Amino acid sequence: MNLIEPKFKLLVYDKKQFKDKDEANNNIALIKNRILDYPKECSIKEIAYYCTNGYPICFSYGIRNNRSSSKAYRDNNWREQQLIAIDIDNKDRQRYTTIDEAICLCKNNGITPSIVYTTLSSTDIINKYRII
């Protein structure tokens, strides 16, 4: 039996890879212009590849009302989203949550993460990660 892997609609990502958070932040305006108008359909495997290899990714899709406006892509333009991503930055050291603890919390609440990965801003001292 061949199983068909589902594709998630209206997912956008940038074709440029970034090696660190500073480089990505310095290019945020360019990234937004490149990705906002080009939704893609991606499988979980494809999404995992993009997320873990430094590609900027957005899990929602919206309509820009004005291409030249920096405020053209806002909440009121949001149209659809099939995946939810939760960022754990562990800013509060007294409430530090390990990846294993976060996965356990999800499962205890009926949520099974599809992808969990450390983000570009993660360090050996403060683990930062995303759960999808």
Region spans (language model):
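Signature for HUH/AEP ssDNA processing cores
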Residues: 1-129
